[in-house]
From Swiss-Prot:
This protein's GO CC annotations: cytoplasm; membrane
Binding site for UDP-N-acetyl-alpha-D-glucosamine: 21, 76, 81-82, 140, 158, 231, 337, 355, 370, 381
Name used for this protein in its record: Bifunctional protein GlmU
Needed co-factor(s): Mg(2+)
InterPro entries in UniProt: Bifunctional_GlmU, GlmU-like, GlmU_C_LbH, Hexapep, MobA-like_NTP_Trfase, Nucleotide-diphossugar_trans, Trimer_LpxA-like_sf
Functional note: Catalyzes the last two sequential reactions in the de novo biosynthetic pathway for UDP-N-acetylglucosamine (UDP-GlcNAc). The C-terminal domain catalyzes the transfer of acetyl group from acetyl coenzyme A to glucosamine-1-phosphate (GlcN-1-P) to produce N-acetylglucosamine-1-phosphate (GlcNAc-1-P), which is converted into UDP-GlcNAc by the transfer of uridine 5-monophosphate (from uridine 5-triphosphate), a reaction catalyzed by the N-terminal domain.
EC number(s) recorded for this UniProt protein: 2.7.7.23, 2.3.1.157
């Protein structure tokens, strides 16, 4: 049986933020959420997160993100070191299994690496995740009985307690380990805080394992990025770019054309058909699906959307919770809000906003317009400056526009109202009553021309 313990109690002072460190986001998800997502795929019977600073906020966020996962939380109050943190989880650990310990601020650990660490433990050994770093400053150093990696592993010395000779060692402990649970419990009970920091170090269990004759082995990740932690905004920004580059490369390998992979951000999942083109500085959030031949212009923000084959999204368009039909044209500078559903070959032009509305095939609103809570038929032409007045101060109401309706410029459609198929609305009208099919609706003051009128003259 496998129990997973995730360390997430730290304050993150260097983040200089009131937000708990593990709730800072990387590619749109909290750091801890990345770790829990990886852990959830390992088949553990229990995912135990150790919280401390901002515990209630952290626990609520993770319960919301993983409603079906076998989550458990224990609190470390006060924070007296990594060993003290794991001691808080002891009552929840199954003696007959293996305990895997991960870091809540090391978000890019791969499931394959975590699994390799558990396999290295094999229920009998203490397995440490180590890596060689060009600059090991701040990390605990691996001590071996000799200079080579194949030499026996004897222990770990924390950076603050290391001698100059020990600090020259490049192999470091990443903070992650796997151990037989029964042995781990025994070692945790023997921890001492007799060190420079007066803390209980989890790393001290290594020397205890050696003393007990338990083999101590090391596993290593495929890349350094997997074990990089976050302690400052600079480190978070570095990890963001590393992850975004990795995601961009995966899309490029799948055939997506990114104008510049260094200027691309994915904060969720992005599914793409063939021949998809994405220009620079686009941000994709939540779950986005792009059909075959979709083209996305520069500087677009697209969240939780489906865009069908052949659609073109022009630059500076914002799409949130919307569906765009095949061959549709959207933007530039358009906004599709939640509930917007555009049919095939619909045109939504510059500075047009659509919210909670459906537009059937071939409908057009090419500039400076608002459609909210509306049902729009096929081939409708919706003039510049026209809006649906859908809110009466208390409730929202719908506007129904039939097929082949022509709405002139600068019209106000006061909902609830229905325009029958083929109706025409004269420009500048405020329509508050239904217009029958095929009829002309005009509601504006009659034009007056005053003959002989002269402009006022400036006084001398």
């Amino acid at each position: 049986m496998l129990d997973i313990v995730i360390m997430a109690a730290g304050k993150g002072t260097r983040m200089k933020s009131s937000r708990p460190k593990v709730l800072h986001t990387l590619a749109g998800r909290a750091l801890l959420q990345h770790v829990l997502a990886t852990a959830a795929g390992l088949g553990a019977q229990r995912l135990i997160t150790i919280t401390g600073h901002g515990a209630e906020q952290v626990e609520a966020a993770m319960r919301s993100a993983f409603p079906a996962a076998p989550l458990a939380f224990v609190r470390q109050e006060p924070q007296l070191g990594t060993g003290h943190a794991v001691q808080q989880a002891v009552p929840l650990l199954d003696d007959a299994g293996t305990t895997l310990i991960l870091n809540g601020d090391t978000p890019l650990i791969e499931a394959s690496t975590a699994r390799a660490l558990v396999d290295a433990c094999d229920g009998t050994r203490l397995a440490l995740l180590t890596i060689d770093l060009a600059d090991p400053t701040g990390y605990g150093r691996i001590l071996r009985d000799g200079d080579g990696r194949g030499e026996k592993l004897l222990g770990i010395v924390e950076h603050k307690d290391a001698s100059a000779e020990q600090r020259a060692v490049r192999e470091v402990y990443t903070g992650m380990m796997a151990a037989p649970t029964a042995l781990l419990k025994r070692w945790l009970a023997c921890l001492s805080n007799d060190n420079a920091q007066r803390e209980y170090y989890l790393t001290d269990v290594v020397a205890m394992a050696v003393a007990d004759g338990v083999a101590v082995v090391a596993a290593q990740p495929a890349s350094e990025t997997e074990v990089l932690g976050v302690n400052s905004p600079l480190q978070l920004a570095d990890l963001e770019r590393r992850l975004q580059r990795k995601q961009a490369e995966a899309l490029l390998e799948a055939g997506v054309r990114l104008a510049d992979p260094a200027r691309f951000d994915l904060r969720g999942t992005l599914g793409c058909g063939s021949d998809v083109e994405i220009d620079v500085n686009c941000v994709f959030e939540g779950r986005v699906e792009l059909g075959d031949g979709v083209r996305i212009g520069a500087h677009c923000v697209i969240r939780d959307a489906r865009i069908a084959a052949g659609a073109v999204i022009h630059p500076f368009t914002h799409i949130d919770g919307a569906e765009v039909g095949a061959g549709a044209l959207v933007g530039p500078f358009a906004r599709l809000r939640p509930g917007a559903e555009l049919g095939a070959e619909v045109h939504i032009g510059n500075f047009v906003e659509v919210k909670n509305s459906t537009l059937a095939r071939g409908a057009k609103a090419n500039h400076l317009a608002y459609l909210g809570d509306a049902t729009v038929g096929e081939r409708v032409n919706y003039g510049a400056g026209s809006i649906t007045a859908n809110y009466d101060g208390a409730n929202k109401h719908r506007t129904v526009i039939g097929d082949d309706v022509h709405v002139g410029s600068n019209c106000v459609l006061v909902a609830p109202v229905t325009l029958g198929a083929g109706a025409t609305i004269g420009g500048g009208s405020t329509i508050s009553k239904d217009v029958p099919a095929g009829q002309l609706g005009v509601a504006r003051a009659r034009q007056t021309v005053i003959a002989g009128w002269q402009r006022p003259q400036k006084k001398r």
